Swiss-Prot record:
It catalyses: tRNA(Leu) + L-leucine + ATP = L-leucyl-tRNA(Leu) + AMP + diphosphate. It is found in: Cytoplasm. It is an enzyme of class 6 (ligase). GO terms for molecular function: aminoacyl-tRNA deacylase activity; ATP binding; leucine-tRNA ligase activity. It comes from Rickettsia africae (strain ESF-5). This is Leucine--tRNA ligase. A motif ('HIGH' region) lies at residues 36-46. It comes from the Bacteria. Its EC number is 6.1.1.4. Gene3D superfamilies: 2.20.28.290, 3.10.20.590, HUPs, Isoleucyl-tRNA Synthetase, Domain 1.
């Protein structure tokens, strides 16, 4: 099988089979899988994503589209730095070696990529464009630097965006993330929050789960900002944001974030307060609050109620208010908010009901809308009316106003690492922050770097960061932070439209290809890459790089490939190939010691539950692997790797070769009967396989093609064979299977005597009239109970059906000589005779 696969891969390369033109009279179709990080080797878990995309690309080509199906490398990132430290070599060497190996692997799987458009994000010819783009953002005040609390990963020694913190830990290292106050570069994604939110409803071809995740991440809240004066220091106020300002008369405390500026100014930091602040610093994002027990510590400060100066409220540092949401301060209304209620019970704060409810708010918060009570001038109003009224009062008093807040925060793009795109800025003691002139781009990373594992090597480089200021020509230093790698992946799909363009994009080419018609990748990118790419597209539209404002028309999120995990007696992970099963138990192949089988999980390097691609290719071939990862479950669902599954796919491919030999040896028999049912099945399969592929029901399409192959095999085994229909059916089967298993189908197609390549052919056409059956079977009922069945010709009339069914012996038995009162027909399904 490997020889056949290598043969066709060579032919496709020589014939430039999958290179496409930007100038074609055909309609365009752009299918794209999320570009991989060049980690070293592709395992079978990766293959599923690429196989799905390849089926769609090949199918749409057969449907008459000019299909763009490119591939490239998301090549910056920390793993390369870790490898550099471990091997004492430059990350570039490790990265380019991995790219070479992985490209070879992808080609060996027969994927129909247009390699002439390949991009590599660590190539200066690529990242020079995003450096220029960053400077354009800076000129528009969409890029800025400020000091802020950031998520610091102490293992990777870098800052993480909120989206890169999962359950309080770094998404790559798994280390517990802490807060640090650092100067960072940000992009103003919040300027586009409203459009990003509103446009979600137009992404009709995206999974509802992803759209919902983005809506929640952007998190629009409508409410009010208003001020509380601090008791005994009334010139100073605390500004709060609330989505339920109408409950102001139920306030019993002010909650502030652990890093609220008022703490530095006015709060005496007791050991209790300092310990609590340290504890809070480990909470890095609002999603973690749901799992955190509500706690607080009193600051010693009180504020005055805005509508009743006799009421004072304690100011409490809480662990459920974050500085990066709203103003970093809230007023707590325990009777009508679950978090506030939990804290009030714990700290013995008052719980005052201000919305009518048939429940005891001392025990549980009532969080629904209703009629206001115990609320002075708001009494008797609905929650909505009271909200408008109280905001009006804030505005009259000059202490507040209506406002909108978003959970989404500006994107922190600074990373304290070497292997990333340098941020093209210079810091001058005289001139301040100075952009690198366009003519001096790209700012390229140095080759002579020392990786000792501590911090960012660019900070310690003896010469790279030292430059003269472009404004005053005095000594200055370069920015040593590099871009978050999501910067590169936020626009790469535009570069594919013309990867040789002298500017960031070839607008004409982008106008032809964009938006991407079908984007394929993991749902884990819903609120990182997919949101950033949407943001970039909007800004690049305004900079006249592209005409679209949304990058991806359709999105498909594939399921993961799973495999069992194994551990030895020392709790070390083992690779599947190191384990052998004896009976119902597992043992280490070399030591013969007992092995514990763990959970079935996503294939990952850390748990070693990977299946090596090259080993599987040697054993079964690329086509069998492709077929298996697509056939055992719907592509949006997880798939468990199984030896029996891949062996079954290998047998099916061998069966195709056997069928070819059997059919090739057949002689035409003019006396054989036409197998109308087989002919109907051929046309039925063409129609429904096309529909299945369009709807990404690839496993169902494979099942239909297996059914057709079984029907053809059954016909071959007969004494009298309808050779013409068998040959036609087998030709169709080979064509239908081509997007799934392209090597063996091209080989068989050639052996069938065909000159044209399958990749150049149109998808088979079906004849609708052939789908009609000559006969159909109807259920015959008497008084609603099944008494018989009867096969009718399609040409039969309703009167004939009634006459035949009434005269059936089994029906006559129940009629007992009576005439039917009524006969009800459900066409081609049921005859119900009423007596």
């Amino acid at each position: 099988m490997n020889q056949i696969e290598q043969k066709w891969q060579y032919i496709w390369q020589e014939e430039k089979a999958f290179e496409v033109s930007n100038a074609s009279s055909k309609p365009k179709y752009y299918v794209l899988e999320m570009l991989p990080y060049p980690s070293g080797k592709i395992h079978v878990g990766h293959v599923r994503n690429y196989s799905i995309g390849d089926v769609i690309a090949r199918f749409m080509t057969m449907q008459g589209f000019n299909v763009l199906h490119p591939m490239g490398w998301d090549a910056f990132g920390l793993p390369a730095e870790h490898a550099a430290i471990k091997n004492n070599s430059h990350p570039k060497k490790w990265t380019y070696s991995n790219i070479k190996n992985m490209k070879k692997q992808l080609k060996s799987m027969g994927f129909s990529y247009d390699w002439s458009r390949e991009i590599n994000s660590c190539d200066p010819e690529y990242y020079k464009h995003e450096q220029k783009f960053f400077l354009e953002l800076y000129e528009r005040n969409l890029a800025y630097q400020k000091e802020s609390f950031v998520n610091w990963d102490p293992v990777d020694n870098t800052v993480l965006a909120n989206e890169q913190v999962v359950d309080g830990r770094g998404w790559r290292s798994g280390a517990i993330v802490v807060k640090r106050y650092l100067k960072q570069w940000f992009l103003k994604i919040t300027d586009y929050a409203e459009e990003l939110l509103n446009e979600i409803q137009n992404l009709k071809e995206w999974p509802e789960a992803v759209r919902s995740m983005q809506e929640k991440w952007i998190g629009k809240s409508i409410g009010a900002n208003f001020h509380f004066k601090i008791k005994d220091n009334e010139e100073t106020t605390i500004e709060v944001f609330s989505t339920k300002p109408e409950t102001i008369f139920g306030a019993s405390f002010i909650g502030i974030a652990f890093n609220h500026p008022i703490i530095e100014r006015l709060v005496s930091k007791t050991p209790e307060i300092l310990a609590f602040i340290t504890q809070c610093s480990h909470i890095t994002r609002s999603s973690e609050l749901e799992k955190t027990e509500r706690e607080g510590v009193f600051t010693g400060l009180f504020v005055i109620h805005p509508f009743d100066s006799n009421i004072v409220l304690p100011v409490i540092i809480t662990n459920f208010v974050l500085m990066d949401y709203g103003t970093g301060a809230i007023f707590g209304c325990p009777a009508h908010d679950e978090c506030d209620h939990e804290l009030a019970v714990k700290m013995n704060l008052s719980i005052k009901q201000v919305i009518k409810a048939d429940m005891d708010v001392q025990k549980t918060a009532y969080t629904e809308d209703g009629i206001l009570i115990n609320s002075d001038f708001l009494n008797g109003l609905t929650s909505h009316e009271a909200k408008q009224e109280v905001i009006g009062e804030f505005e009259k008093l000059g202490i507040g106003k209506r406002s909108v807040n978003y959970r989404l925060k500006d994107w922190g793009i600074s990373r304290q690492r070497f292997w990333g795109c340098p941020i093209p800025m210079i810091h001058c003691e005289i001139c301040g922050i100075v952009p690198v002139p366009y003519k001096d781009l790209p700012v390229i990373l140095p080759d002579d770097v020392n990786f000792d594992g501590h911090g960012n090597p660019l900070d310690h480089h003896p010469s790279w960061k030292h430059v003269n200021c472009p404004k005053c020509d005095k000594p200055a230093v370069r920015e040593t932070d590099t871009f978050d790698t999501f910067f590169e992946s936020s626009w790469y799909f535009m570069r594919y439209c013309n990867s040789n363009a002298t500017e960031m994009t070839d607008k004409k080419a982008c106008d032809y290809w964009l938006p991407v018609d079908k984007y394929i990748g993991g749902i884990e990118h819903a609120v990182m890459h997919l949101l950033y790419a949407r943001f970039f597209t909007k800004v690049m539209n305004e900079q006249n790089y592209v005409s679209v404002r949304e990058p991806f028309k359709g999105l498909f999120t594939q399921g993961m490939v799973l495999h069992a995990t194994y551990k030895d007696e020392h709790n070390n992970w083992l690779y599947p190939e190191e384990v052998v099963k004896k009976g119902n138990e597992f043992f280490h192949k070399e030591s013969n010691n007992r092995v514990v089988q763990g959970r079935i999980e996503k294939m990952s390097k850390s748990k070693k539950n990977l299946i090596d691609l090259e080993t599987m290719q040697e054993q079964y071939g690329a086509d069998a692997i492709r077929l298996f990862v697509l056939s055992d479950s719907p592509p949006e669902k997880d798939l468990e790797w199984s030896a029996s599954g891949i062996e079954g796919c290998s047998r099916f491919i061998n069966k195709l070769e056997y069928m070819f030999k059997a059919i090739d040896s057949l002689k035409d028999d003019v006396n054989s009967e036409v197998n109308k049912e087989l002919n109907r099945l051929v046309h039925f399969t063409i129609k429904h396989v096309a529909e299945d592929i369009k709807h990404f029901a690839l496993n169902r399409a494979i099942a239909r093609m297996r059914e057709l192959s079984n029907a053809i095999s059954a016909e071959i085994s007969k004494d009298k064979i309808d050779v013409k229909t068998v040959r036609h059916g087998f030709n169709v089967l080979v064509q239908l299977l081509n997007p799934f298993i392209p090597h063996i189908t091209e080989e068989i197609w050639q052996k069938l005597g065909n000159k044209e390549r399958l990749y150049n052919l149109s998808f088979p056409a079906f004849d609708e009239s052939m789908l009609e059956l000559d006969t159909y079977i109807m259920a015959v009922q008497v008084n609603g109970k099944l008494r018989d069945t009867y096969e009718f010709k399609t040409s039969v009339s309703e009167d004939e059906i009634k006459q035949v069914t009434v005269s059936l012996p089994k029906v006559q038995k129940f009629l007992e000589g009576q005439e039917p009162k009524k006969i009800i027909l459900v066409p081609r399904k049921i005859v119900n005779i009423l007596v």
